[in-house]
Amino acid sequence: IQAEKQKLIKAGKIKKEKPLPAITDDEKPFEIPETWKWVYVDDICINLQYGTSKKSSTNGKMPVLRMNNIQNGRIIYDNLVYSSDDEDISKYSLNTDDLLFNRTNSKELVGKVAIYKSDMPAIFAGYLVRITPMIISGDYLNYVMQTKYYWNYCQYVRSDAISQSNINAQKLKRFKVPLPPLAEQKRIVAKLEEILPLCDKLK
């Protein structure tokens, strides 16, 4: 992981930052197989980027995804707003398998996440944070961030104001992810994508 990050730092793709302390045995949330390891979100992502703060409109060149477009781990293209700002379009255009994290919302919904699959070109708004996965399947990370374990973390670290709650990027970086080998991540994703539609039909 660290070797891969060093390559990206040398290439100028990410900035060098002080690494988080190693996860001790006492800090591990639960038992995982020997071939897996505990990592922080910060260890497995290229960067965490806040979205545009510029005003959007009902018409424009490109959709601006907002927190209402994140539902059940997927992007929903309803009630879209748009931007024609070329600088923002260049800076905030989403790439396949980027994850969007909702940093500000009600206390029940703050922290919700969805994966972007290039259904249509889009950028993202300021209440969202882009997570760019590295050495991890974006789909696997997205499924981890739909679990009760993840939601318990969000409820624990959120900061509450009068009408909304917030989880900043520093708290997101410290979320601990159970990381299997990449081939196993892909098998887990394939199995979930096989059985979850069946579960939905039973509801």
Feature locations, PLM:
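Non-catalytic DNA-recognition/assembly elements of restriction-modification systems
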Residues: 22-50, 182-190, 195-203
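Sequence-specific dsDNA recognition surfaces
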Residues: 23-27, 42-54, 68-98
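Short, ligand-facing micro-motifs at secondary-structure edges
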Residues: 70-82, 99-124, 139-143, 151-158, ...
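Short coil/turn segments at secondary-structure boundaries
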Residues: 17-23, 54-61, 156-158
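A short glycine-rich beta-alpha junction/loop motif
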Residues: 121-129, 139, 159-179
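Extended, domain-scale alpha-helical bundle/helix-rich regions
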Residues: 1-20
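Interdomain signal-transducing alpha-helices
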Residues: 131, 141, 145, 185-188
